[in-house]
Amino acid sequence: MKVARSKWTILIANILVPISILVFSSGFFPYKTLLTGFATHEHTIGGQIPPGVFDKVLLLQADFHASDFVYSQHSGFLFTQRLGGGFLIRSGAALPFTAYASAPTVTMPRLKAITTGSVPSFLDVILNIAEADTSSTLMHQDTWLAQLKAKGGKLVMYGDDTWLKLFPGMFHRADGTTSFFVSDFTEVDNNVTRHIPNELLQDDWSAFIMHYLGLDHIGHKAGPNSPYMITKQHEMDSVVSMVYTALEQEKHLKTTLFVLCGDHGMNEAGNHGGSSVGETSPALLFISPKFQRLETRNDSPTEEFSDLQYYHTVEQTDITPTLAGLLGLPIPLNSLGVFIPELLAMWDHGAKSIPLTSSSGPHRIHMLLENAKQLLGAVKGSFPSYSFEFDLMPVICSSQSLIDIERVQCAWFRVLETLNGSGANHDSEASSEIESALLLFLRNAQKLMSSAASDYDLIRLYVGLSISGFAISLTFFPAKRLLVNFAPAGMFLGFSILSYSTMMFASSYVEEEQQFWYWISMGWVVYLHVKYAGHFHGNSIQKSGPANGHWPFEPSLPWFGAAALAVSYRVLRRWNQTGQKFAAQPDITGSFFPSHQHTLWALLSLAASDSPELLGNSFLQPVAMLTDGMHLLYHARMVLCGISLLMIYSLYAGKARETTHKGRGKWPPSTIFHETLTLFLLMQSKVTNIPAFLVFRVQITILASMRLSTVEQTITSLLMQYVTFYAFGGSNAISSVDISNAYNGIGTYSVFIVGALTFISNWAAPIWWVSASRLLRSSQNREEKEAHVTILTLHMATILMSVMAACTTLRTHLFIWTVFSPKYLYTIAWAMINHIVVNVLGEIDWRLFMKR
């Protein structure tokens, strides 16, 4: 009865884990409250509408367009830097900026920032992968595209189909390409370029959007320093040349604004999503022959900056009000952007007409006034209890210590005071004073609104915490009884759980979590060495007990096996440098393999693919002849089908063997299943990570030669899952998510399949260790297997609650969206998929099909 009760207790605890996640997430990631409707010019002070300088916009959006790609001396954008005998930027035809892109630096949130001017929700990180999702649409939100559409303009778009998902039915002509086939460097861009010559001849569009993906795909597959990168930069530069030439030659394009920008950058590993300098510093250029009259002169190319802040740095959200103003459109209601001051010169600074309080006046002043009133409306909507009446100014602004909202109030009062004091005085000095006051207010308001805490649902946060706490209480006492029987190992596990839980409240430790697992695993090796130094033996694994004949090795290991285990851990630690502090340090995959490629390919030699002539008259020759000339997609599908058949066979054979009570052979079904799974995981891993599976083999062979207890086997499995995840380049940053293998064998997009393959490719090493540890535990009885699940559940529930508690306590922390929120998303993946699906449900599947 006690065993049955314990079983139901653990089942309930594992059900409570996803429930707690759903409840907590609904309070932690609420949809933002936005102002409804669309902006109009009716709200402009004095009724003055600043005239548009341009009537068309051509946006060239280059995914992963870091600032140094355009501005540095090593850039491939030669035409962008050089125009004839001079320089495009130096001539003033292009105004260069670095546009700061706040985290999360993935495409969908950044496109929302560029088109609405607002700071996107962190939940868009998930929606960025779910391409079929429609909840992220901007169809009913105020954007500069919607304003153009309302004005009667036609929009065309070619490239990343994220635009089609954000703006369904808005484009007059469009041809979208999925952004996740990252192995494609050429077709995704050629599909855009082929439309350009014809579209440049058309005069019916008001906005022409081109979104190129090639740079981003090269970065994901080979990193930002790939030799393919400079070639792709030359290709993008040729597109700039084509467009700019058309602006000069085509009459209907004389009043067209050309904007070249990136949605995000990329880190040294070739990924993005986080907040490193490389990820948050894309380039931004406003290009038009009209800008030459401003007589702006900038050096180009320029010296390199380690922080990538070339020229003047603006916020990416500033693009929205700037485009709206230059095109003569109302600024979208929810925009937090500030009109870029350098472009105000497109209106006459010295215009002298009549007082600013009347219906006319310097257009640049009215542009900033419109921007200020729009942003003031957003501030009032978020802080309804604060008044912006001028009469309150002496009371509030006399204080020496002001909070952010009070600084915004005082800045607005300063604007009103300056406007009222100017009266009929409309000379250049008065205009400059008003501009300064307006820009001060705009920057303060932008800072306030961009950093304002989300509207958390605290009740749901606390309920989610309580549910996870209840899951811990359900598993604590069953696990305690198990751990007490194995005191040293139990104390070690308890210490690691408490240490980890405490560590989650420090942002630096969260960023460098891999260090915790590396050190704790080395401590575990020391423990195993002290306990089992005298128990290494030369017998086969079958005689030692744990593997029970299910492991295909019969090692003869001496007493120094623990030392070899420690060395292997050290190798894994340097396999991929991850985290933030040491990410740029030399490692095996980034430093050794690139300079010793013969070593890598010796480990990965695939004669059938690279040298089919070496097959000779072997039995594989017919296979090579059959697949000769076949599309690579079908190659991948054939391999996946073969792997699937082997897995099905191993499961069926295991069930049949249990039914017929046949004896065990050298290759029992459980081993076949594991080896087949290994083949699949190799397919889903980066090429440079594949040799690490050999290190895993060495480790599991050593561990199989020890007489580990039930608890020790569980702790070993748990530690290895986390250690190898970070050894393969994982971290707590969104930018470490690898999508380079998310489309293996897939011809069309499927959110479920792509999501599953993305998880498998990033958790390939932990999945391997879950399977390998089952072979290690194959001699365990039912109670021992349930004890294994109990300990894992206690560990996962405690980790989940500690991360939830940290996110709740530190919800107003500066790094809540760059450190703690990504950590929470990773914890969801660890709990929902790795723990429940791979560990718990996988254990049930193993017991159903494999003979114990």
Curated annotation (Swiss-Prot):
Q: Which residues are glycosylated?
A: N191, N420, N576
Subcellular locations according to the entry? Endoplasmic reticulum membrane
State the Gene3D superfamilies in the record. Alkaline Phosphatase, subunit A
CC terms in the record's Gene Ontology section: endoplasmic reticulum membrane
Indicate how the chain sits in the lipid bilayer: Multi-pass membrane protein
Main localization of the protein described in the UniProt heading:
endoplasmic reticulum
Q: What class of enzyme is it?
A: transferase
EC numbers, comma separated = 2.-.-.-
Q: Name one GO molecular function term.
A: CP2 mannose-ethanolamine phosphotransferase activity
Q: Which pathway does it operate in?
A: Glycolipid biosynthesis; glycosylphosphatidylinositol-anchor biosynthesis
Q: Which residues cross the membrane?
A: 458-478, 486-506, 516-536, 632-652, 676-696, 714-734, 750-770, 787-807, 824-844
Per the record, the GO terms for biological process are:
GPI anchor biosynthetic process
Report the domain of life of the source organism. Eukaryota
Which keywords does this Swiss-Prot/TrEMBL entry list?
Answer: Endoplasmic reticulum, Glycoprotein, GPI-anchor biosynthesis, Membrane, Transferase, Transmembrane, Transmembrane helix
Regarding protein family, the annotation reads: Belongs to the PIGG/PIGN/PIGO family. PIGG subfamily.
Purpose of the protein: Ethanolamine phosphate transferase involved in glycosylphosphatidylinositol-anchor biosynthesis. Transfers ethanolamine phosphate to the GPI second mannose.
According to UniProt, the name of this protein is GPI ethanolamine phosphate transferase 2
